[in-house]
Amino acid sequence: MINLEIKRKKGECVTPFVAFGYRKTKTDKHKLEIDPSAGSVVQDIFKMKLQGMSQDAIANRLNELGILSPFEYKISNGSRYETGFRQKEQALWSSVTVRRILENEVYIGNLVQGKRTTPNHKVKQTYVKPEDDWIRIEKNHEPLVSDRDFEIVQRLLGMDTRTSPDQKQVYLLSGIAVCADCGAPMTRKVSTVAG
């Protein structure tokens, strides 16, 4: 455990599987480099979000285009990656997968490790450490997204930007407009009463 801690603090990637959009370099398995195919998908996801698309609309678009989900992409590249999230024969893109990508600061070049730990080597159950105890190395590798775009996306994710099932884009004032009296966010309400 101490060895891993030292490697993490030196900016070495010690996880067996890296974030979608990156791969380990051939010369040093502890360093990350951009995977051109998956990296362009990540950049497209951020662009779609910046254009006002919801996570659900982004996931649907990626599925329509036949783009492999992170799980399927890893499998297609010979990885023995397993996950508990797979529910069907082929794992498709979901709004949860898209949101995880949009929130992951690995895409601005930051390596964040040591989020989980076990009480000791005999106990297999892990728990999430407080964020202050995570090891964060900023500007560790080449980013896929600019800091500015990442920050804008984080602000968008913090707003209520739900859309109706038949709508692809978020309303212009979603998550911004608030009630002048109580300060609650304004939401869309469908009326079924005629008149």
Annotate each PLM feature.
Residues 1-195:
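Conserved catalytic breakage-reunion loop centered on the nucleophilic residue
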